[in-house]
Amino acid sequence: MTEHRLAVRHFAWLAIILTGALLQACGPNDKGAAGPKQRVFAADVAGGAKVCEVPKVSPTNDQPTEAAIRMTNDGGWCGLPVHQSESKPFSAGLLSTRPSHGTVVIHQVGDETRIDYTPDRGFAGTDSFVVKLLPGNASVRVTATVSGPVA
């Protein structure tokens, strides 16, 4: 019984040491450059459309930012990443104009806010919607061009 407890205790210490080493590996290196900053998990990319083309978007408070996305309708979503200046995610997003042929989900993924559009089943064509981002007065007008699934 004593030998078993000793083995479990050593395993626990080994796990703590390895966790610390892993966290240190993700930090700054000896040249001062930062390690990986944005964490994206498998759940963040699962279910995405096979074809999804999105532009780089940096919304400002002055006027609505235009974003055109192109995707196939294979049952998946197409995600448009947006962030405030200094790579800071927005706190929230409000759907001010709804899409006519799909759904929108606004959520945070790593250091960005992501606007996910999923077209209705069988839809092919053009759809659009507007998202207001908080804090501030930034908004994004998204035009989605959806093609049928690739065979």
Predicted region positions:
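Bacterial N-terminal signal peptides that target proteins for export
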Residues: 2-14
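Surface-exposed or secretory-pathway low-complexity segments enriched in glycine-proline
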Residues: 73-110
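C-terminal motif of bacterial Sec signal peptides marking the signal peptidase cleavage site
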Residues: 22-25
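C-terminal edge beta-strand
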Residues: 32-55, 68-69, 137-151
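Bacterial signal peptide processing site
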Residues: 27-30
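Post-signal-peptide N-terminal segment of Sec-exported extracytoplasmic proteins
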Residues: 46-87
